């Protein structure tokens, strides 16, 4: 096949080539492109941080620290966003009024109101107590409102006047009123409901004055403790005090043990699903279990709790000592009568009490009967003598006095012990805080074995807590044995149970059951703030949505620009390489064809 070709030689001035791209130019273009992209990325990060920093999770432990510090400061009564609430605790020996406050709800339906106790200008808690108890008005119920007037006047002076009409008042009566006949209870409450609104502008209705049961009081105490400890917070946080969480992000709540002078109380959360029980135990469980929702929306179950609560009258430290002395007196006198002995009838032949320090002498009197006792400090024998007072049954699911007890998962639980649980471990033994059974038993046994003269000398030398007195020294041996038996034999706590903490204060303050009461009573108040927040969010939702979309669009544009710069640099590189490969043959062809025409000899 023949090949036809055409050739046309142009003047040298007509020839041109693509200019070579220097490395310096490429570096300059790349530097400018990267600088431009870096500026855009930095601008995007600044905008992103300023827009979303408010919603980023903060250090919850640091926030809680700030909240605790803030609770010790005087309440700013000039703040119009603060709300107030009053709770009157009408007890058996007196009545106290507590003033609480809280800011506007944060708009998160998962959070409760942030209720705190009000503090005056001197940063002291706003609380006032009067005596006697309101039950003293049983025969003159028409004076019940006069009885409470000093408390309400005190509260009215601390709550801003413009807030009175929206400040709820709750009058909750406990042990003293429970002992009165229902007719007298209703007469006292009726006088309060009728007369108090005539003098005070607080938000108060008939349902806000009531006599609460021991079960309700226990539930309120459980709510208050767990609220202060932050156990109702459902965020995922690294708090060393409570890192274990339950299903659906719920944190593990703590149980409470509270031993007073006359009664003993236990309260703890139980699973919603329990094993099938016999009919008799099932009925007992229903009486002792309380299920409630602390959330503001009944449709949401994240704040639904099921709590076992029981109060044991006569199982407090002082009352248990009286029961023990009655037991010793009766058994000793009966034994003397049967065996013809005279133990305890004179100081020379006393009854040797294992629950008193060595050498301590005392006299037990009941009516006309007298028993002389002297301590022998045998803690193990003391525990054995106290076992019958627990009145346990043979069933494994029964605790003190044969009362049904819901199972406790001791491998996944935590308890706080208050009142006598703290006094027994701290006032004399100085081991309050984290409880360890064997350590406590050793310290209690050593104390009981000491001579009374040695103990009194140590007390004079200030070796015990400042709260300790002669009464504590005298009955510490007995109360430590009683506490130990109640905890391990009565409630079946393992002897090496590691998650019990004895305490008097929580974060430096005493937590009253009234805090739990107002938390429960005001649980629906956040609905108002939530509705207002919903309206505000509806107006701003379009802007937030458009901002998010523009945010991602801006980021995509940066990527496109970056890709274009890279492709442009690659294109320049290919052009340069192609130009370099073609330059040598082109120059040679030009020399071979053009130079001979000029009469120049090329080659040898």
From Swiss-Prot:
**Could you name the active-site residues?**
217 (proton acceptor)
The membrane topology of this protein is: Multi-pass membrane protein
Per the UniProt entry, the Enzyme Commission number(s) are 3.6.1.15
Keyword check for Lyase: no
Q: Which InterPro entries match?
A: GDA1_CD39_NTPase (IPR000407)
What one GO molecular function would you report for this record? GTPase activity
Q: Among its keywords, does the record have Nucleotide-binding?
A: no
Alphabetized CDD domains for the sequence: ASKHA_NBD_NTPDase4-like
Q: Which keywords belong to this entry?
A: Calcium, Cytoplasmic vesicle, Disulfide bond, Glycoprotein, Hydrolase, Magnesium, Membrane, Metal-binding, Transmembrane, Transmembrane helix
- Give, as one word, the top-level EC class: hydrolase
Going by the UniProt annotation, this protein carries glycans at: 330
Give the subcellular location: Cytoplasmic vesicle membrane
Gene Ontology cellular-component annotations? cytoplasmic vesicle membrane; Golgi apparatus
Q: GO biological process: what's one of them? A: UTP catabolic process
| Principal localisation | membrane
Membrane-spanning ranges: 29-49, 547-567
User: The organism sits in which domain of life?
Assistant: Eukaryota
The catalytic activity, as recorded, is: a ribonucleoside 5'-triphosphate + H2O = a ribonucleoside 5'-diphosphate + phosphate + H(+); UTP + H2O = UDP + phosphate + H(+); GTP + H2O = GDP + phosphate + H(+); CTP + H2O = CDP + phosphate + H(+)
Q: Which cofactor does it need?
A: Ca(2+); Mg(2+)
State which ranges are Cytoplasmic (membrane side): 1-28, 568-604
Q: Residues on the Vesicular side?
A: 50-546
Q: What's this protein's family per the entry? A: Belongs to the GDA1/CD39 NTPase family.
- Task of the protein: Catalyzes the hydrolysis of nucleoside triphosphates and diphosphates in a calcium- or magnesium-dependent manner. Preferentially hydrolyzes nucleoside 5'-triphosphates, with substrate preference for UTP > GTP > CTP. Hydrolyzes ATP and nucleoside diphosphates only to a minor extent.
Cross-referenced PANTHER family? ADENOSINE/GUANOSINE DIPHOSPHATASE, ECTONUCLEOSIDE TRIPHOSPHATE DIPHOSPHOHYDROLASE 7
**Listed name of the protein:** Ectonucleoside triphosphate diphosphohydrolase 7
Q: Which organism is it from?
A: Pongo abelii
Give the encoding gene's name: ENTPD7
């Amino acid at each position: 096949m023949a090949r036809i070709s055409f050739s046309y030689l142009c003047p040298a001035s007509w020839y041109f080539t693509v200019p070579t791209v220097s490395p310096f130019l490429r570096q300059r273009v790349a530097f400018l492109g990267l600088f431009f992209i870096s500026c855009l990325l930095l601008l995007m990060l600044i905008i992103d941080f300023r827009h979303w920093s408010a919603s980023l999770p903060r250090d919850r432990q640091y926030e809680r620290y700030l909240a605790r510090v803030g609770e010790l400061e005087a309440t700013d009564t000039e703040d119009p966003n603060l709300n107030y609430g009053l709770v009157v605790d009408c007890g058996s020996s007196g009545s106290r009024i507590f003033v609480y406050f809280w800011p506007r709800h944060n708009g998160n339906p998962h959070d409760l109101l942030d209720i705190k106790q009000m503090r005056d200008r001197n940063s002291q808690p706003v609380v006032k107590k009067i005596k006697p108890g309101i039950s003293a008005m049983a025969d003159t119920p028409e004076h019940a409102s006069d009885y409470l007037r000093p408390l309400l006047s005190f509260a009215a002076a601390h709550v801003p006047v413009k807030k009175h009409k929206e400040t709820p008042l709750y009058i909750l009566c406990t042990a003293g009123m429970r002992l009165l006949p229902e007719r007298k209870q209703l007469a006292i409450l009726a006088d309060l409901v009728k007369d108090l609104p005539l003098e005070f502008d607080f938000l108060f209705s008939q349902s806000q004055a009531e006599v609460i049961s021991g079960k309700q009081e226990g539930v309120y105490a459980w709510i208050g403790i767990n609220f202060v400890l932050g156990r109702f917070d459902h965020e995922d946080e690294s708090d060393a005090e409570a890192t274990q969480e339950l299903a659906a992000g719920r944190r593990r709540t703590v149980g409470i043990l509270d031993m007073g002078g006359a009664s003993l109380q236990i309260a703890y959360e139980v699973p919603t699903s329990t094993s099938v029980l016999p009919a008799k135990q099932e009925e007992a469980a229903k009486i002792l279990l309380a299920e409630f929702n602390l959330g503001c929306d009944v449709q949401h179950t994240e704040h639904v709790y099921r709590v076992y609560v029981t109060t044991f009258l006569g199982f407090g430290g002082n009352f248990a000592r009286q029961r023990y002395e009655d037991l010793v007196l009766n058994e000793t006198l009966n034994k003397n009568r049967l065996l013809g002995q005279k133990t305890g009838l004179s100081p020379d032949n006393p009854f040797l009490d294992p629950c008193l320090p060595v050498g301590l002498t005392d006299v037990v009197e009941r009516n006309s009967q007298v028993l002389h006792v002297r301590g022998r400090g045998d803690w193990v024998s003391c525990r054995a003598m106290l076992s019958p007072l627990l009145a346990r049954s043979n069933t494994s699911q029964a605790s003190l006095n044969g009362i049904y007890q819901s199972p406790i998962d001791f491998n996944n639980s935590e308890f706080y012990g208050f009142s006598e649980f703290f006094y027994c471990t701290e006032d004399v033994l100085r081991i309050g805080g984290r409880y360890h059974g064997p350590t406590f038993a050793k310290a209690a046994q050593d104390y009981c074995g000491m001579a009374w003269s040695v103990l009194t000398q140590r007390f004079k030398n200030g070796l015990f807590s400042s709260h300790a007195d002669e009464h504590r020294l005298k009955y510490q041996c007995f109360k430590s044995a009683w506490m130990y038996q109640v905890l391990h034999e009565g409630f079946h706590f393992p002897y090496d149970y590691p998650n019990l903490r004895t305490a008097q204060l929580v974060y430096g303050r005493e937590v009253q059951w009234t805090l739990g009461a107002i938390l429960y009573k005001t649980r629906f108040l956040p609905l108002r703030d939530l509705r207002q927040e919903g309206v505000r969010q509806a107006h701003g939702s379009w802007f937030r949505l458009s901002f998010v979309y523009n945010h991602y669009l801006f980021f995509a544009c940066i990527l496109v620009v970056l890709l274009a710069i890279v492709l442009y640099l690659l294109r320049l590189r290919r052009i340069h390489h192609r130009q370099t490969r073609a330059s040598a043959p082109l120059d040679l062809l030009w020399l071979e064809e053009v130079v001979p025409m000029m009469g120049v000899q090329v080659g040898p």
